[in-house]
Structure formats: structure tokens, C-alpha cells
Swiss-Prot record:
This is Tetraacyldisaccharide 4'-kinase. Its EC number is 2.7.1.130. Belongs to the LpxK family. ATP binds at S54, V55, G56, G57, T58, G59, K60, T61.
Length: 326
């Protein structure tokens, strides 16, 4: 898998983005061709698909966790299907607590705490396992742009800091598909992190299906210490903002590519950087923390959860449309 940092030209239109537009047109055509030729299959349960229209972290994992807790509280059987990003996964697998990130991906290792999880590169390859588990609901983490299976309910996650970047498709911009298409088709739109008038104006046409959500810390962390933050996720800036908003003294930070698999040498380098910054304590995300399974470390992990301002809208939309819930 190619691992990239979020390039600066994805956020604002400039000469590099314009030079890459012809390649974006090819990407758009291939996506159209793929969708036109696809024959969507029906999965053996109701499908809730959580995705985004842009590259990078938009809070999808936290939304999936929120849904898992919601369904569990209603005694609805479900399975989570995730792509296994950053893993060496070859065949679809039911995730267990002994699996590592290299085997099933960071999302799989995190999500297994909240319910049954299948890690797969191809949704069709997961079918035998889904049939074996017989869930009432399938929560699909990502796969939003995959036209090969029917989706009963779609949730599009939008990060309020980056929004839609420069508005161009990959590789000229961060978009997997144009926002209007994704948002028009969505049953719910999650706006994750802080909001402002500009964002709300852009999303005004979708106000009847808009969920405002915040990423909030779960654990108590010593605020008297200095911290050196590092992260290899899709949107590290949001993580750093969360740390500062929480009142932590961040004296330095280092960004790694998304879904980065750390080596012992990386850990040693991070310890050196922390020492150079007033003997700071290392702090990172849960997605990064789970990758240090085999490495000795003394790292603080910031655990977070999703807090939404209008849960009644979420409940009403999902339970009313799905029609299978108790």
C-alpha cells in the first residue's frame, strides 16, 4: 500500500493542482465506468455504510463505534466490515483480540472491542463469513464509493477543518467523489469537530439530515506534564487540536503517513525527540498506539469518543428507515 501525507496543495487551488487536473479527469472517468458496469449484490442483512467523499480522517471510526454501541443497546445483532488498511491481509477474516495491526489493520484491532468485525479487502469475499454470522445489520466502514453492493443507509462524514479541500478530485485534490453527489445521496451527514458560519452555509441544503459531532477525550491525562505528540492518521491536525483544546502543553509534534506501521527505530527516534523537547512525554492516538503491540514503550494514549448534539435525529433516521429495529 502506498502511504502518503496530505499534501498542502490539496487544501488550496494552485499550479500543482491545476497541472494534475488531467489525471483527475481520468480518475473521474474510471470511477464512472466502474459504477456503470457494476452489478450491485444484495448482502444478507440491512447495510449501514459509513464513508466520506475525501481522502484523510473524517471521524469515520468514531461514527462506527457510536453506531455499534447504539445497536448493542437495542439488542440488534450486527457485524462491522472494515477494509484492513495497513495490513497484509489476503483473505477475509473474522477479527479476534489476538490479531495484530499487520494482520487485520488498525481499525479492525480497535473495533473488535465493540462487536463482531470482519476485515476484508473485497466486500464479496466477506460474504461467506457474513452468512456464517447471520447478523441483522452490517455496518460497513468505508466502501462508500464501492458500487458492487447495495446500501440501505449511508452516512457521510465531513471534517470541519479541511471540509472538501481545494474541490478537486484525486490526485489534484483530496476528493474521491464530488461532495454534492455524496451528500445528496446520503441519509445522514456528520459534520465532525468545530463548526463555523462558512461550513454551515455550505451544508445548509442538508440541514434536515445534518448531525453536528465533536471528538471528545475519554481519559484523564496529567495536564502538568509536557507532551510530544505524534500521529500517523488521516487528519493529524485534528488530533493536535484536540490535545490543545484539552489543555495539554504540546511542546512538539511529528507527523507520519496515514496507516503508518512503526518500527523500533521510529520509537527510538521519538524518544530522542521527546527528550530534546524538555524531556516531554510521548502522546498519540489509539490508532497509532495499537501498532506498538510488540514494542516496549512508555507512551500516553488519548482515547476519544463521539459526542453528537442531536441523537434523536440519528435514532429517528436510522430506526425509521431500516424498519427492522426493535
Amino acid at each position: 500500500m502506498i502511504k502518503l501525507l496530505y499534501p498542502k496543495f490539496w487544501q488550496k487551488q494552485n499550479i500543482i493542482a491545476y497541472l494534475l487536473l488531467p489525471v483527475s479527469l481520468i480518475y473521474q472517468f474510471l470511477g464512472y465506468l466502474r459504477a456503470s458496469l457494476a452489478q450491485p449484490i444484495m448482502l444478507p442483512a440491512k447495510v449501514i455504510c459509513v464513508g466520506n467523499c475525501s481522502v484523510g480522517g473524517t471521524g469515520k471510526t468514531q461514527i462506527v463505534i457510536y453506531l455499534a454501541k447504539l445497536l448493542k443497546a437495542r439488542n440488534v445483532s450486527f457485524v462491522i466490515v472494515t477494509k484492513g488498511y495497513g495490513s497484509k491481509l489476503k483473505n477475509a477474516a473474522i477479527v479476534n483480540a489476538r490479531h495484530t495491526v499487520l494482520e487485520v489493520g488498525d481499525e479492525g484491532v480497535i473495533l473488535v472491542k465493540y462487536g463482531l468485525v470482519i476485515a476484508t479487502k473485497n466486500i464479496k469475499e466477506a460474504l461467506p463469513l457474513i452468512n456464517e454470522l447471520k447478523p441483522d445489520v452490517i455496518i460497513v466502514d468505508d466502501f462508500l464509493q464501492n458500487p458492487h453492493f447495495h446500501k440501505d443507509f449511508t452516512i457521510v462524514s465531513v471534517d470541519s477543518q479541511r471540509l472538501f479541500g481545494n474541490g478537486f478530485l484525486i490526485p489534484a485534490g483530496p476528493l474521491r467523489q464530488y461532495p454534492n453527489k455524496a451528500l445528496d445521496a446520503a441519509d445522514l451527514v456528520f459534520l465532525v469537530s468545530s463548526t463555523n458560519d462558512k461550513m454551515l452555509n455550505i451544508l445548509t441544503p442538508y440541514v434536515n439530515k445534518l448531525i453536528n459531532a465533536q471528538i471528545v477525550p475519554l481519559n484523564n491525562i496529567d495536564k502538568t506534564k509536557n507532551y510530544f505528540a505524534f500521529s500517523g492518521i488521516g487528519n493529524p491536525e485534528r488530533f493536535f487540536s484536540t490535545l490543545k483544546n484539552y489543555g495539554l502543553n504540546i511542546v512538539g509534534y511529528k507527523i507520519f503517513p496515514d496507516h503508518y506501521n512503526y518500527l523500533q527505530a521510529d520509537l527510538e527516534n521519538l524518544y530522542s525527540l521527546a527528550k530534546e523537547h524538555n524531556n516531554a512525554t510521548l502522546i498519540t492516538t489509539r490508532k497509532d498506539y495499537v501498532k506498538f503491540h510488540d514494542l516496549n514503550n512508555n507512551i500516553v494514549c488519548l482515547d476519544v469518543e463521539l459526542s453528537i448534539n442531536n441523537p434523536n435525529l440519528l435514532n429517528e433516521k436510522i430506526f425509521k428507515k431500516a424498519q427492522i429495529f426493535n
